[in-house]
């Protein structure tokens, strides 16, 4: 029989185990890798679990340590953790006190995703592509794996909704290191060919590593350069990629993507055409009916029932013009008859002879008066000319010189008129009636003025 003193209380055992945990150097600082689980962000200390495929451990990160984490924790994020193992006495559970935490694997990818997302958003690329899709597309390009369920779902949906749409598959690698380059190559090929109304790019679900090619910057920029609307259908509805932000539309599934590019089904289109046909027929019927009413009203109008009234006033005006024309012609003929009678009377022979004699006398008298006037004018002009010649002769410099006067010039022929024009030692020329005399200035003396 075991002594009662050998039984330990739960508290005692828990305290003992806690001391063991705290004293064990291997548990004082442990390095773990795991996936975050049961995480819900709180104010202050953070509680969550770390798990792998076979085990799970509770974790606690105090406020001071958590404030140093530069990224947001998310459910399922793989992390590298440094901490110590301790036992929580009230519940008897051991847990990890996390002192340092950083992303690992998917966590690192998530951090890269956030960085690229912020970069592209700052460039305004997420708000750039908001182009509308055509109601009745003719050609749509699909960039995806040729063997996956994505293309099958798209083809099935299009065949059901809008079978006249031409789908063109551009097969691409959608997972792995070569996927991003393959996607960019196919997008550039679509842009070069041209003529497509829209592009669907996508793949099925998977881990973040599987979906990572659709988070590559080169793929995002290739999508930005596409000249037609882009529909993204990557992963499941809960998955979000950079491609989703860049695309004009995001579809949760390949079926939804096919529905987006075929907004109007063929049946809807045919029904709409039928409705438009009915509206067109009704509109034409109404127009014809209205036209018939107008024709009937026109047939009953005065213009058609009494057409003579249209040109009554013109007939009256023609009559007035005719009367005025006849009166004008009558007056002109009467005046012509009068002038003819006058001319005839003036052509009488005796009257003509008398007129000729009178004209001859008039011409003779005019000629005599003209001769007298011409002789008087010539005599007057001759006298005036002789007087002018005599006056000019008296004013001639030669006449003046002939009376003993002279004029003086310098070597250049400039006339020297006053004392100021002369210079001492200057050679001058004195002009007289029959020649000139050279002289030299030796003195200057002002006599008056």
Curated annotation (Swiss-Prot):
Catalytic activity: Exonucleolytic cleavage in either 5'- to 3'- or 3'- to 5'-direction to yield nucleoside 5'-phosphates
Key words of the record: Cytoplasm, Exonuclease, Hydrolase, Nuclease
Cellular component terms (Gene Ontology): cytoplasm; exodeoxyribonuclease VII complex
Main enzyme class: hydrolase
Claim: Metal-binding is one of the keywords in the record: no
Entry keyword annotation includes Cell membrane: no
Coiled coil regions, renumbered to chain: none
CDD domains, per database record: ExoVII_LU_OBF
Major subcellular site: cytoplasm
Compartments, record wording: Cytoplasm
GO biological process, one term: DNA catabolic process
GO molecular function terms attached to this record: exodeoxyribonuclease VII activity; nucleic acid binding
Entries under Pfam families matching the protein: Exonuc_VII_L (PF02601), tRNA_anti_2 (PF13742)
InterPro entries registered for this protein in UniProt: Exonuc_VII_L, Exonuc_VII_lsu_C, OB-fold_nuc-bd_dom
Enzyme Commission number: 3.1.11.6
Similarity comment text for this entry: Belongs to the XseA family.
PANTHER family: EXODEOXYRIBONUCLEASE 7 LARGE SUBUNIT
Functional note: Bidirectionally degrades single-stranded DNA into large acid-insoluble oligonucleotides, which are then degraded further into small acid-soluble oligonucleotides.
Subunit composition and interactions: Heterooligomer composed of large and small subunits.
Protein's name in the database: Exodeoxyribonuclease 7 large subunit
Source organism of the structure: Lacticaseibacillus paracasei (strain ATCC 334 / BCRC 17002 / CCUG 31169 / CIP 107868 / KCTC 3260 / NRRL B-441)
